């Protein structure tokens, strides 16, 4: 084995060999990777995480509630779409929708500015991550106004679902206390 190691070093392949050896050990050490959701929610790049997981030889995913909402949004459910948008806006993560998935939020932004641009948006301000900042006042305002608009749309959709499904026993849920 000494000659093999020596020839790897002589040929300038030692770094690559060590990396591949580590990958092999990691592959053999983890027989099955069991992921307990949520993959989708507040992180900046769930698409990269999924790509990495798909490369693993044996992965099992137990989808979480946030993952299921994203699947519902991808399937076209209006209430799931609003929920995903509301969550990404609440955590100032909506850039991921535009950059990773090509979802244009310009129409939402224009509508939100038209109806709510001059409102007090203090309760709609996003949670921010200093590591991903800095955030300008304009950035936070745009996010907050869209957050308010999509939340109102989501609340209206939720009311329709509750009205259509009395067996949910959620008639007591009301958004009339909110100042929208």
Residue ranges, per PLM feature:
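Extended charged low-complexity segments that act as oligomerization/scaffolding linkers
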Residues: 73-124
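Short gly/pro/ser/thr-enriched loop/turn and capping motifs at secondary-structure boundaries
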Residues: 67-70
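Low-complexity, highly charged intrinsically disordered N-terminal segments
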Residues: 1-22
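A short alpha/beta connector and helix-capping loop motif
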Residues: 48-61
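Divalent metal-coordination and catalytic microenvironments
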Residues: 38, 65
